[in-house]
Amino acid sequence: MKKWLWFPIGILALIVIVGIVFFASLTSGKVIGAMLYVDEGVVQVDSGNGWVAGQDGMELSINDKVRTLEGKATIVIFEGEMTRLEPNTEVSIKELSLESATISQNSGSTWNRLTKLSGVAEYNVETPTTVATVRGTGFGMVISGQQNDLLVGEGTVSFGAKGTAGEPISEGWKGTIASPLVKTQLNQEEKNWINGQMSNDIESLKKLRLDIINRHGFALGVIKTTFGLTDADIEQGLKDIDDGKTDEDELAKQSPIQIDDLDRVIAITKEIKKLLGTAS
């Protein structure tokens, strides 16, 4: 039997419970409004005082700007929704609330994953001339000169020029706005790009999940020392859950305490399994 499965409530629940019972004063369970992941290369942030190097895991605020130059980055909104920046892309956080979050994309290409994990009611991506509005989907936005392309990988996105009602663009289709809006089916290269972004979504969600677990770092250290666990054991335990070998709901049910961080970890795990195709 794997070491991490020695515990009747599983590592996910145990980490959180020990943290909340013994170290409650150190673990607030606060949800971060916006956070930056530096995925690759140089990423810069401007919070109003000029461009500086962005740091992996740093918090972002409304009106902050992010640009990638030759790098890549992911902005995580309310620990659930994600906007991934390809190289040579610049965005800013225009609106940040659970009622509505808006990313303003000034240049380049983004991939946007709406998981509904955060509770954000409406998510918008604006360019200088267009706006895309969604309530749960995955789509790309590409700015090339005066042309804006919306590539829909999942669900349906309302897309149109600013000041218009917008038109629905469905999964597998592309909306192009130069003037007027043109709908075409995605070509194979565009489909491959979307598939790659979906794979990246899984890795970003795994990183987010581990960040939430590591908030209870002191408790995690106690658990590892007491039971002889290594980081590799914990990673393998999470992988077993993701691969459908262990049921995260059964682990959660055995927890005598239900708190937000545990709920978030379970919800993120379900989204990972959905993208992997291992959800029951």
Positions of PLM-derived features:
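Flexible, surface-exposed loop/linker segments and immediately adjacent secondary-structure boundaries
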Residues: 19-61, 65-70, 77-174, 178-230, ...
